Amino acid sequence: MGWSVNRPTGLTYHRAGLSTKGYTLFTPHGDQKTYLIGMDGQIVHTWMFDHIRPGYGRLLKNGHLLMTGSDINLKFPEPPGQGKSPPPFEERVKMLGGYHTTLLEVDWDGNKIAEYDNRFQHHDFFRRENGNTIVPVWVELSDEMTKKVRGGYKEYRERLPNLIGDEIIEVNADFEEVDRIRIWELMDPVKDPISRDVKRWEWTHVNGIDVNERGDIVFSARHNDRVAIIDAETHDIRWKYTKTHGQHNPTWVGDGNIQIFDNGHAGSRVIEVNPENDEVVWEFHGSPYPQFFSGHISGASRIPGGNVLVCEGTSGRLFEVTRNKEIVWEWINPFVNMTRGNPTTSIYRAHRYSPDHPALAGRDLDPERYGNLNRLNNLDTPAS
């Protein structure tokens, strides 16, 4: 779905009586800043990055920001021409969506606390209560495994490389590896083929992870249209869901249910699935269906109280929806940036934090501190 370049931006709609108070964190693609906005859509805090291109972040309870990013001096290789050999694995990963080189932790004022460099990490992360961090990483598969994997397509006269697969690693506070789960060993090369609209460069493309209190990991494998749960004790897959397309951001909600942003073919939806019986117990989609659509990136997070914050990533549209499927808050990204030579307003994901969240305790969240920035982007204009 397209949108007008003259569309309104900033806060476009708000029903204060039905929305959930809080502050929303997001990072526009191509920007050098991460932003925190209030319910009136105005910026109340920013973090500036000078040595990475920031990707996606989360606030920790101590007020630190944990952020993915890429080396600001990173050079992206050109795609190989017809009949040309593909670049080596370490260069090929730079061409993939969600690629990062860095996981950076900064304090409230942007001072570096810790930095983890791994040239094969991508997309997402999860910080455990014990301080360990879980991240997906890309690995190159063997000739034998590449031949076993079904599906996908190749372009005319394209020389295909070995497939890229996924592993999930856990590192401690000193960034020493303490665990590794090989997704490519858990998936079935025949029963979990590459989707037919995906090029045969990657098998799984893990783009989202979440961990419950027991330690079970739920992950999304976008290129297979799969969401799966890895058992904490056995490291085996104990549940697999196959009724989405190009999905993102699976999260644990409620009593063990899984919430998923299902990107879809011509319209997107947010669903809550019961893993015990695969029943979709809640669903939100556009009306008409194509009114809500993001073909890639995007996410949805459950807010305390039951509402859901949705990030329609491609368009840079954030909105809050109730359990009765009513949109009660909407904010559209006014920041236009350049990503790989193209203008964009997209946002990978967003999170809402309640006013009493520990990370916000004692913080100055007065939007007047950013008065000029808010006025410059018309963020100080109330929604009609």
What residue ranges belong to the model's regions?
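Histidine-/acidic-rich catalytic cores in large beta-rich domains
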Residues: 1-384
